Amino acid sequence: IALALAAPGVRIFAPIPGTNYVGIEVPNRNRQMVYLPDVLAAAGPGPLQVAIGEDVEGHAIVHDLAKMPHVLIAGTTGSGKSVEVNSMIMSILMRATPAEVRFIMVDPKRVEFAPYEGIPHLYVPVVTECREASSALSWAVAEMERRLKMFSKCGVRNIITFNEKARAAQAADEAAEKRGEEPPENPYGEPIPYIVIVIDELADLMMNVGKEVEFSISRIAQLARAAGIHLIIATQRP
């Protein structure tokens, strides 16, 4: 089909969802630029709305990372992995404060996340050494377990409910202070931020500190959704 159409390649959809037809997608020779603000205009509420792009009909695709809850982006060199990772990062930075979302960025290539060095959303400086990456992921596992224990103690199921109750308790404290009364006991403390862990080129980490990294990523992928910790991972090789 690609030969007959003189196209660089085609994609087959068999069937097109909701129909009994087979779809053939042929790339347009004249590419249309997709701008991040245009895609984000379709985003709903929430600090973890991330821009994916546009579909073949030009409709914006935006997803909530809190519901996904983790992302694995794979592809060859030049396929657009880094563009998508940076789009996701910028989607969050444009809509969330450091009190709402914090990042841990792992960059074995040392150049991909260099522009983000020093931003207030970072928990730690951009991690470039494999051993440091292993330690950062181990810390994330410990933080996940600490949060889950705290949720259990407070009788909540996830970070959304915890933060709602924490804000309500803060409002009650402020109202009591204005009335000159002693504030009620607040078992929740401050609202806690989401944590987004972004790893560029996972294969490099797996070759150097595979066992430690694999254990931490597995634990986070299995249990961290309720704790508000999410993974965005890019790799060339599985």
Regions found by a protein language model. Give the residues of each.
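Cytosolic ligand/metal-binding cores
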Residues: 1
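Residues at the beta-strand->loop junction immediately N-terminal to the Walker
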Residues: 13, 74
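P-loop NTPase motor-domain active sites and their immediate coupling elements
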Residues: 17-62, 67-68, 99-105, 142-238
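P-loop NTPase switch/communication element
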Residues: 66, 93-131, 135-138
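Conserved beta-strand position immediately N-terminal to the Walker
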Residues: 71
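Conserved lysine of the Walker
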Residues: 81
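Hydrophobic positions on the alpha1 helix immediately C-terminal to the Walker A/P-loop
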Residues: 84, 88
